[in-house]
Structures are given as C-alpha cells and as structure tokens.
Amino acid sequence: MVDGLNTSNIRKRARTLSNPNDFQEPNYLLDPGNHPSDHFRTRMSKFRFNIREKLLVFTNNQSFTLSRWQKKYRSAFNDLYFTYTSLMGSHTFYVLCLPMPVWFGYFETTKDMVYILGYSIYLSGFFKDYWCLPRPRAPPLHRITLSEYTTKEYGAPSSHTANATGVSLLFLYNIWRMQESSVMVQLLLSCVVLFYYMTLVFGRIYCGMHGILDLVSGGLIGIVCFIVRMYFKYRFPGLRIEEHWWFPLFSVGWGLLLLFKHVKPVDECPCFQDSVAFMGVVSGIECCDWLGKVFGVTLVYNLEPNCGWRLTLARLLVGLPCVVIWKYVISKPMIYTLLIKVFHLKDDRNVAARKRLEATHKEGASKYECPLYIGEPKIDILGRFIIYAGVPFTVVMCSPVLFSLLNIA
C-alpha cells in the first residue's frame, strides 16, 4: 500500500506490439523530481531553488485530479490511439519523416521545421533540467506508453507540446499564405492541423505523462521558437550570413557550446540526449545549406514538388533507406572509430557506465531512489552530435545525387 493505494501487480508490461505498457511506480522516489525540497536546496543556487519552489505549487496536488480525468476517459481504444499518436513527437518519427519535404521540393519549409523543433527540444530540455519538476505521480495515475525510458524524465515543460505548438503554428502560417487555394481548402487543412495538435497535447495528459503546467510551459516555448524563427527569416532577408566562409565553424561551435554548457539536473534525466541529436541536425542542415550556396550544389533546390505518385514513391524508396543505413548501420561505428582511433579522443564511456551500474545496484533505502546526476560521456555528446549532423547531409547532399542518377529528380 502507498498512500492508501494498492500497489500489488502495479507494473503491467505489454505482451504484444499492439498493446501499450501501463506503468505505475509505487516507490515514487525512483522517478526524478519527487524528493523533498532539502534534496534540491543543497544542490541548486538560491535563485534556481526559489523558482522551483514557486512552480511546485502547480504540481503538488495535480495527480489525483488528473487521475480522475484519466479514469473517466480510459478505454482500450484510447490507450492505443494516444500512445501510437504520441510517436509523432518521437525521436524516430523525426528521423524518418523530417527528410520527406526536402525530397519533394520544400527545403525551406524543412529548414523552418528543423529550427523550430530543434530549439523547442533544446529549450524544453534545458528548463526540465533547470526546474527539476516531477511528472504527475503514478499511482494514482497510470503512465501509458510504449517505452519506460520516457517515464524517467522530469515533467515541465512538455517537449511534445513545445514541438506540436511550434510546428502547428508553422503549418497554419503556410496554409493561410497559399493564395492559390480556396478558403474552404484552407479551413479543412487548418482543421487537420488543429486535430493533430489537440491529439498530441491532450494525449500527454491522457497517458499520465504531463500536467497543466507542463503543457502551458511547453506551449509557450513552441510559440517563442516559431516567432523567433519567423522574425529572423523575414526581418533580415538580405543578411545571408550562411554564405560566409566562417558560417559552418560558427554553426558547429554554437551547437557544441549550447550542449557542453547545458544546465546540470539534480537527478538523472535522459532528455539531454534529444537535445544533442537536434542540435546536430540544426548544425547539419546549416552546413548543407552553406555548401549548396557557396559551392553551387543546387540539386536539392531543383527538386520538383509536383512530381506525381510514381516519382514520389520512388524518391521515398531511395531516400529513406539512405537515412536508415546512415543512422542505424554505418554512422556509429564509423564516427566512434574516427574519434578514438584517428583523433585520439579519450573514450570516457566506461566511466559513466560504471557510475550508472553502481547507482542502480545500491543497497538499503537508496536503491528505492533515482540516482543523482551522472551525466553523458563527452565522447557520446560529440559522437551523437556528428551522427545526427550527418542525417541532413544524407538527405540534402547524397539523396538528390541518387535521384538525379536514377532519373527521379
């Protein structure tokens, strides 16, 4: 029993691919952010701790209210619907789906999405680690998800909400700028975007992953990222800093600076890995754009958007395997071999792995608590950054060459 709740048989794992997992953690200190205030007071600056204490007012009593709402609408169909639609905010979804607009002639739109998504992920991860606020507790909630990994992050802000907000605003902005479309078509497309948005955002509450503060703060981050991207894109159209020789150095340096100076959480939280991935993608697409404009590599800019279903299918059948082969087959062994064997960087992965092993095999009361912050190996940060920077190179530089050779450009 925990706070009057029966905790027997409280963790239910899916037995088939189609069924989501139902997680409850009776030892709530195993989830980050749930320790008493003294745990954070000694590990935070006074300013940071005071902000956290003020925000706790919005999270302390949310779990039972959210649990009643979840119980009211819980069904097998909703479990499947909201867990699988949540994949539209997942890491793998972006790896496979973000390249597609590039192959159909929408490179600039993809750049907009990469900037908005990349900085939404970074800022939401930064504030998660800065505030160290807990997710709603389960029990009384059920965390309905396809992966236990995501349940071990802090709560606010919601990165799913930040992404959905920024991208939905971008879609709506582009829809209402389509002068060749009728108002009826624009309204229909807007309804589709809003349906996507409501599904992704309210799904976070239904799945027991986030509370109201998480959604509001995530939404604000998405709005800010959209406004900043649009402001710089249209306010300084003639600046063209991406055409200067130093721009790739600045892009890579800026991305790595943001990552190596990222705020340190108090407890272990895996969301930093997504920040590394997206900062790599941002830098990668900037460097590809620079190569295209400085050296005249224009194949990606010449791809025709209205190409018919045969060419559309052909580009997908050629482009997607290229991305999968780079990301999931050759990139990791190649990049780590170069970093360790050629550039002689120290491989510090074993040190972090040993610390994690020790943290998860504690004796006594401490084995019922999440470990304190251990951090990512420096070689993993650099390696992951380069691997994900390689995804835009595969999409923007390699795939259009293959399209041209196969006469599907």
From Swiss-Prot:
Cross-referenced Pfam families: PAP2
Annotated stretches, region: Disordered: 15-35
Residues that span the membrane, as ranges: 87-107, 113-133, 183-203, 208-228, 246-266, 277-297, 316-336, 385-405
Catalytic activity: (4R)-hydroxysphinganine 1-phosphate + H2O = (4R)-hydroxysphinganine + phosphate; sphinganine 1-phosphate + H2O = sphinganine + phosphate
GO terms, biological process: calcium-mediated signaling; phospholipid dephosphorylation; sphingolipid biosynthetic process
Ranges facing Cytoplasmic side: 108-112, 204-207, 267-276, 337-384
Positions of region (Phosphatase sequence motif II): 157-160
Keywords: Endoplasmic reticulum, Glycoprotein, Hydrolase, Lipid metabolism, Membrane, Phosphoprotein, Sphingolipid metabolism, Transmembrane, Transmembrane helix
Entry-linked Gene3D superfamilies: Phosphatidic acid phosphatase type 2/haloperoxidase
Topological relation to the membrane, as annotated: Multi-pass membrane protein
Organism lineage: Eukaryota, Fungi, Dikarya, Ascomycota, Saccharomycotina
Protein name: Dihydrosphingosine 1-phosphate phosphatase LCB3
Lumenal side: 1-86, 134-182, 229-245, 298-315, 406-409
Enzymatic class: hydrolase
PANTHER family named in the record: DIHYDROSPHINGOSINE 1-PHOSPHATE PHOSPHATASE LCB3-RELATED, SPHINGOSINE-1-PHOSPHATE PHOSPHOHYDROLASE
Main location: endoplasmic reticulum
Site (Stabilizes the active site histidine for nucleophilic attack): residue numbering on this chain: D214
CDD domains according to UniProt: PAP2_SPPase1 (cd03388)
Localization in the cell: Endoplasmic reticulum membrane
Signal peptide feature range: none
